[in-house]
């Protein structure tokens, strides 16, 4: 049986979780005329326009451009699937928990589009010469920002409210799991060069911390999406609490060790960006080693805060079997 999560008081509500006072109509074209349906149409159109503008001029060279193009295409495709399921009333036949899947995707999509809206103009668009390609790239960035706001709005509308019975992924800890795994993926992208950490066992430990915490958080998300939380040998609430506490402790060590061994000269670090020859001049589609080290340090702090908030909010959840 699936696990449903509520906040302190268990109540039943027939109104939509968007708080707009009317339920989402499914299995009918009228689903598109409801506020949530219209919002998803905006998501669909904005991501479609973004990747179409870039594709029409081939403005996605390099890893950063490829990431942005993947983001828009992926978000468009999954949003289209969600709309089709809603229109045809196929929620019961969907292989994943419909109570958890849409908001999980919306949260990921908001983060994906946010990253594309920042990475694409800063690492790609600014290096384009003035002309049609640059104009299309700037317009694509604008529509990417619209998509980000639209997905974030869906998360705000459909997240759990106090006293409401809902899926775990709609709660604050569930949404924080999405943030934690997303930030970890960005960290992995920045440490893709083994030369950043292989020279020090302490830095290798940090990489192990990122991997362990990512895997545990991903398992929690997948168990909820697959509605198979009962397969664990321990109660699911205990698993979540232990996961959050362990992750806080592990990330605390990484937050100390990573900056210490990357930026302190006594431990072989490089305190000044000017000393890194790879940062001596601007490169299109490339982030120099010192900037990567700094980005990982900042992202480590962000994820530690996310895990602390996760641990605190998890104590306020009440789990019931349905």
UniProtKB/Swiss-Prot annotation:
Tissue-by-tissue expression: Widely expressed. Not detected in thymus.
Keyword Signal: no
Disordered: annotated segments: 1-21
Lipid bilayer topology: Multi-pass membrane protein
Record flagged with keyword Methyltransferase: no
Modification sites for Phosphoserine: 22
Similarity comment: family membership: Belongs to the MAL family.
Alphabetical UniProt keywords: Membrane, Phosphoprotein, Repeat, Transmembrane, Transmembrane helix
The encoding gene: MYADM
InterPro entries recorded: Marvel, MYADM-like
Domain MARVEL: 31-163, 168-319
The protein's name: Myeloid-associated differentiation marker
PROSITE patterns attached to this UniProt entry: MARVEL (PS51225)
Membrane-spanning ranges: 41-61, 70-90, 101-121, 137-157, 171-191, 203-223, 239-259, 294-314
Sequence ranges of Low complexity compositional bias: 1-18
GO cellular component, one term: membrane raft
Cited PANTHER family: MYELOID-ASSOCIATED DIFFERENTIATION MARKER (PTHR17068:SF3), MYELOID-ASSOCIATED DIFFERENTIATION MARKER MYADM FAMILY MEMBER (PTHR17068)
Species assigned in the record: Homo sapiens
């Amino acid at each position: 049986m699936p696990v449903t999560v509520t906040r302190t008081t268990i109540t039943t509500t027939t109104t939509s979780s968007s708080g707009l006072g009317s339920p989402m109509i499914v299995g009918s074209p009228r689903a598109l005329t409801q506020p949530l349906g219209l919002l998803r149409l905006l998501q669909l159109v904005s991501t479609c326009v973004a990747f179409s503008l870039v594709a029409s001029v081939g403005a996605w060279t390099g890893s950063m451009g490829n990431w942005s193009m993947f983001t828009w295409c992926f978000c468009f495709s999954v949003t289209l699937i969600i709309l089709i399921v809603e229109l045809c009333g196929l929620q019961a036949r969907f292989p994943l928990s419909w109570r958890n899947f849409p908001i999980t995707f919306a949260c990921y999509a908001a983060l994906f589009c946010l990253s594309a809206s920042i990475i694409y103009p800063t690492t790609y668009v600014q290096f384009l010469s003035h002309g049609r390609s640059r104009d299309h790239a700037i317009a694509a960035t604008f529509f990417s920002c619209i998509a980000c706001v639209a997905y974030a709005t869906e998360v705000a509308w459909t997240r759990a409210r106090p006293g409401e019975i809902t899926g775990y992924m709609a709660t604050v800890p569930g949404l924080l799991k999405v943030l934690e795994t997303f930030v970890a993926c960005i960290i992995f992208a920045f440490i893709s060069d083994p030369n950043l950490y292989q020279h020090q066992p302490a830095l290798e430990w940090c990489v192990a911390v990122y991997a362990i915490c990512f895997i545990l958080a991903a398992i929690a998300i997948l168990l909820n999406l697959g509605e198979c939380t009962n397969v664990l040998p321990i109660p699911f609430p205990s698993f979540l609490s232990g996961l959050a506490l362990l992750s806080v402790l592990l990330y605390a060590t990484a937050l100390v060790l990573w900056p210490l061994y990357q930026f302190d000269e006594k431990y072989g670090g490089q305190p000044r960006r000017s000393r890194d020859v790879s940062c001596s001049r601007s490169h299109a589609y490339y982030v120099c080693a010192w900037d990567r080290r700094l980005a990982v340090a900042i992202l480590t702090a962000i994820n530690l805060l996310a895990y602390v908030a996760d641990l605190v909010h998890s104590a306020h959840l009440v789990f019931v079997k349905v």
